[in-house]
Amino acid sequence: MPSITLLHAGFYSSIQDRGRKSHRHIGIPHSGAMDQSSADLGNSLLNNALDAAVMEIILQGGTYLFSHSTRIAVTGAKASIRINNILVDQNKVLEISAGDLLKMGATSSGNFIYLVIAGGFLTDTILGSKAVYHNITKKNKTNDAPEM
């Protein structure tokens, strides 16, 4: 199974989608991406369903190693994005080869960076969403599950 290995964590990252819209009456918040238009842009660029899971990265990105070839998009807040130490543009499709290293720096404008992968992140769906909400979704720490 293709995976992304987290080599260095940024400030805070989580998996998000369009959220849980019908569970507030039982105390479950909407959740979902904080900048839905940026998440949608990444999914659209990759021809993913708009509700495909994305990684939401707050303020400071990390370093990620790809095990297989794929396509990604990085949208949202402006930041330094490098693949194999080569600066790349945001808001476009980026081709990734097995063994490529993605490094995201701190944001220079905005708060939320979105890492979007072709097909979306494969995570559990709970109450109709893949969005992280710590009271109902699995709690992982970097050393518990360094591969995604």
Predicted features and spans:
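Conserved "landmark" site that anchors the functional core of diverse proteins
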Residues: M1-M148
